[in-house]
Amino acid sequence: GKQLPAKLASGSELRLSFPLGEDPKAATFPLRSADLRIGFRALAPESNVVVTLNGRTLFSGLPASGARFVTREFVTKPSRQPDLAEEYLHVALPNEAVIAPGQNDFRVSVVGGSKPVEVTDLEVRYDYQNDLGQIWNRVPAR
């Protein structure tokens, strides 16, 4: 069934089964970095957020102590179709071994704030070292 969006009361934990099809170890280019992006609504700045992936704590602290992006701070005028999330928390993945192809266990808990928090989306981003411009424009061998 549909896992997101999901409401999360203060002090409770949201657990998601997160399937992933991409295997960075099988990619043509080496992995430069990977991060996890989590979308929230009604996340109070004083809330303590804990993010766990496959049993490993990746982030624990105030949203402002991480890479936190508030959508309304970047958008000059309201979009005709706004994002479901009001803000995003980006968490760097230390290496590709943390997340594996197949099912992954994602957990997030929030303590603090007077209203329930809504987790709107979850995304893994891979950044590969590719020199496609250099490959495309290379000088032929003589």
What name fits each language-model region?
Residues 19, 35-41:
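Short edge beta-strand/loop segments characteristic of extracellular beta-sandwich folds
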Residues 24-36:
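Extended extracellular/luminal ectodomain segments enriched in beta-structured repeat modules
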Residues 39-138:
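Beta-strand-rich ligand-recognition modules
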Residues 2-27, 88-91:
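Short beta-strands within extracellular/lumenal beta-sheet-rich domains
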Residues 1-7, 135-142:
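Activation corresponds to long, low-complexity, non-globular regions
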